[in-house]
Amino acid sequence: MSAADANQLQESLEKLNLDSAPAAAEEEAVAAESAPAGEEGADSANVAESTASLYVGELNTSVNEATLFEIFSPIGQVSSIRVCRDAVSKKSLGYAYVNYHKMEDGEKAIEELNYSPIEGRPCRIMWSQRDPSARRSGDGNIFIKNLHPAIDNKALHDTFSTFGKILSCKVATDDMGQSKCFGFVHYETAEAAEAAIENVNGMLLNDREVFVGKHISKKDRESKFEEIKANFTNIYVKNIDLEYSEEDLKKLFTPYGAITSIYLEKDAEGKSKGFGFVNYEGHEAAVKAVEELNDKEINGQKIYVGRAQKKRERMEELKKQYENTRLEKLSKYQGVNLFIKNLDDTIDSEKLEEEFKPFGTITSARVMVDETGKSKGFGFVCFSSPEEATKAITEMNQRMFFGKPLYVALAQRKDVRRSQLEQQIQARNQMRMQNAAATGGIPGQFIPPMFYGQQGFFPPNGRGNAPFPGPNPQMIMRRGQPFGGPEQWPRPGPNGQPVPVYGIPPQAYSDFNGQNIRQQRGYYPNRNQNKGRQQRDLAAIIASAPPDQQKRILGEELYPKIVATGKAQEPEAAGKITGMMLDLDNQEILALLEDDELFTNHFEDALTAFEEYKNSEAAAPVAPAAPAEPQA
């Protein structure tokens, strides 16, 4: 487009009221206000004629008013254009309204531009129907199915336009733009629709026999569904011998009544797939065939015979069956199924059952294992009664078993556990905010232990000083990571200060002492030196640590994870949020550390509480400063 053309287009757009073309709901109000009382029938048509409003559909979301003006303005003088957009996101809904001053220009636009590509996608143009009753009326609307995938909107329009004036025409497509092999044609008159049904129904279009009939709204179809269901004539047959032909199937079902059609599903090679359909003339014959032939053994295998169902109906029934089975299973095991964790790796299902057998009758016991058969450290034991399960919880929870304290509780679904944790932390956040309002601050700030040394080096011992102490929660690595490179230890805290982490096994201590001098000079231990050494499980560490140290250990795990989110920007934010989250039970904190999604949810709640506190603190009135005393 030349510069002159661009300037002319810009000037034309400025003259247009691009927002004056009302959307569908607004159009109805405009039409209603324009028509005088008592003359609605004739005058509503006059309003439509005077505005010459066109609906333009199937548009790309990138199409805007300027693009449409460039396409439609050569036809005639455009009065207004509007691309309809989402009220919130302002993204195009894929359709627009173009208004001409003259009716002739609108007709010409439909003739010349309908189904023409706009940004690579064929558009669909029709007269705007402002009367909702006319749009929703079934008169003149027909439904076509079993269309060839190659038939698009234009091909469908060209095929059916010979029977009368078409108001709208559309082939249904999926999200990828592929045809669903059915479509709709809306004629101006019911007579044209009847003519199309009479002439095209049963015809071959692109070597496919199509069905053409009156369009029935979804509401009407669903209201008639129960009636059709109760008077079915079509039956489904499966588990048929693969050697059976349609003729054999006909001989089997003919004794029960007159058959209108038989269909046996076959593969690409023409071989039977073992199922098919039989349609009777009357409902009684279909019912009799189902009663007589269902589960009947033919050629050594039982066949299934039942009422034919649509895919949607089958899916709904299967979903209901699954839900009923799930609820039945939940009620069956409610209060009797126990969850046991912190099991030693040597414990198998037999040992677990043997340990819990004294408390009652066990219906099942299982230790969960991975793909290699190695224990995951937890399992389930199901008793025959809730009383036995309660006794087992009372006696076995926190009992030492193979050197590890067991955690025993009633088994819960994952979604239930997550919901409970979320409710607990929300309740605690509310209590914290109330306490903060009462005391003037957020309680429970966690101050992580820090070393103030040169950034990038380990804390120096100094010449002649004693080496670092033994395994200390303030001086050891995160669990599950080898003792290695500079990015692992010390981890950066606020202002670039290194923050100690947790998890060095005791056996690494000898190597640690021997490397102090090298560490002071900027050297780091070999990554692979301690490779293969197992780290102690954090849950076991917490269980074996003194009560006054447990929260500190967990805090050293939470703090770097909170810092790593990058959302705790203020210097004190990470410490205060860590303090909030440390108010949770130890088991809840362990769950947060294991589940990133759960951690994120609780962190966001705590961050919101902290920000609300800061905002309320900032909004509080500040006492005026005392005037400065004059200096001598």
Swiss-Prot record:
Main location: cytoplasm
Location in the cell: Cytoplasm; Nucleus
GO MF assignments: molecular condensate scaffold activity; poly(A) binding; promoter-specific chromatin binding; ribonuclease inhibitor activity
A Pfam entry, by short name: MLLE
One of the GO biological process terms: regulation of translational initiation
UniProtKB keywords: Cytoplasm, mRNA processing, mRNA transport, Nucleus, Repeat, RNA-binding, Translation regulation, Transport
GO CC entries: cytoplasmic stress granule; post-mRNA release spliceosomal complex; ribosome
Residues annotated as transmembrane: none
Residue span, RRM domain: 52-130, 140-217, 233-310, 336-413
Alphabetized PROSITE patterns for the sequence: PABC, RRM
Polar residues composition-biased segments: 1-11
Domain PABC, chain residue ranges per copy: 534-615
Region of interest called Disordered, as start-end residue ranges on this chain: 1-43
PANTHER family assigned: RNA BINDING PROTEIN (PTHR24012)
Function according to Swiss-Prot or TrEMBL: Binds the poly(A) tail of mRNA. Appears to be an important mediator of the multiple roles of the poly(A) tail in mRNA biogenesis, stability and translation. In the nucleus, involved in both mRNA cleavage and polyadenylation. Is also required for efficient mRNA export to the cytoplasm. Acts in concert with a poly(A)-specific nuclease (PAN) to affect poly(A) tail shortening, which may occur concomitantly with either nucleocytoplasmic mRNA transport or translational initiation.
Similarity comment: Belongs to the polyadenylate-binding protein type-1 family.
Protein name in the entry: Polyadenylate-binding protein, cytoplasmic and nuclear
UniProt source species: Scheffersomyces stipitis (strain ATCC 58785 / CBS 6054 / NBRC 10063 / NRRL Y-11545) (Yeast)
